[in-house]
A protein has these predicted regions:
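Repetitive beta-strand solenoid architecture
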Residues: 7, 28, 37-39, 62, ...
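Surface-exposed ligand/attachment interfaces on beta-rich extracellular proteins
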Residues: 9-28, 49-52, 81-94, 110-111
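Intrinsically disordered, low-complexity Pro/Gly/Ser/Thr-rich segments with frequent PxxP/GP/PP motifs
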Residues: 11-12, 51-71
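Short, intrinsically disordered N-terminal pre-domain segments
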Residues: 1-22, 144, 169-182
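Small/polar beta-strand repeat architecture
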Residues: 70-182
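Short, solvent-exposed coil/turn segments at beta-strand boundaries
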Residues: 27-30, 101
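Short, surface-exposed beta-strand/strand-loop-strand elements in extracellular ectodomains
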Residues: 37-55, 177
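Asparagine-centered strand-capping/turn motif at beta-strand->loop junctions
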Residues: 32-38, 165-167
C-alpha cells in the first residue's frame, strides 16, 4: 500500500447531476486524490473542465489517485505590465508552460502582481533578440493598473488546474487533495 503525503489545502465540492467546478488549484504535485462522499462522481481535470458521465468515475466506496502529469513551475525574473502581462524566466531555463496552459503568479511582498488561473497566449524562446537570451511568455492578464516596482526575490509561476465533478443523479460531496505518493 502506498503512503500519501497531503500537499496544500483539501477542497470539497458539492456534487449533483450537473457539473460543478473547483476554484483554481496551483499545481504542487503530480497527483490528486479524489474521495466521493455519499454518491460516486465523475471527474474531469483541466484548465476549465466540465465533468460528464463519460469522464473518470470515482466510487463512493474507494478513493482515486489521478495523475496530473509533471509539475510546471518556474522562477520569474521580470514582469512587464500591460493589457497582457509578459513574464521573463531566468536565462537558460526555458518554459515548462505551453500556449493554452493556465498559470498562477505569486510575488512575495508585492501581492498586487499576483494573479490566479490566467491563460498563456504566447511562448517566445527566440535567443539573442537585442542581447536578450531569456524565455518570455505572454499571459492573458491585464496588469496595467499595478504601480509597484517588481522585485523578483522569490517570484514564481505555477501551472494551475481546476477539478470538475458530477454525479449521475444523487447529491453528495467530493474531496480533492493534492498528494505525494510514496
Amino acid at each position: 500500500m502506498a503512503a500519501l503525503k497531503p500537499v496544500g489545502v483539501n477542497l470539497n465540492i458539492t456534487t449533483s447531476a450537473t457539473s460543478a467546478q473547483s476554484a483554481a488549484i496551483a499545481q504542487q504535485t503530480d497527483s490528486v486524490r479524489i474521495v466521493a462522499e455519499t454518491a460516486g462522481c465523475h471527474v474531469a481535470i483541466g484548465t476549465n473542465p466540465t465533468a460528464t458521465t463519460a469522464d473518470f468515475y470515482v466510487s463512493p466506496t474507494d478513493d482515486a489517485i489521478i495523475s496530473l502529469g509533471p509539475v510546471g513551475s518556474q522562477r520569474v525574473v521580470n514582469v512587464t505590465k500591460g493589457a497582457s502581462t509578459v513574464i521573463d524566466f531566468p536565462e537558460g531555463t526555458g518554459s515548462p508552460f505551453a500556449v493554452g496552459d493556465a498559470v498562477s503568479l505569486t510575488v512575495p511582498n508585492a501581492s498586487t502582481y499576483d494573479f490566479e488561473h490566467k491563460i498563456v497566449t504566447a511562448v517566445d524562446s527566440t535567443s539573442n533578440v537585442g542581447g536578450f537570451y531569456n524565455t518570455r511568455i505572454t499571459i492573458d492578464h491585464d496588469s496595467s493598473s499595478v504601480t509597484a516596482g517588481f522585485n523578483n526575490a522569490g517570484a514564481s509561476l505555477r501551472r494551475s488546474i481546476k477539478v470538475a465533478v458530477r454525479t449521475v443523479s444523487a447529491a453528495g460531496k467530493a474531496y480533492v487533495q493534492q498528494v505525494q505518493v510514496s
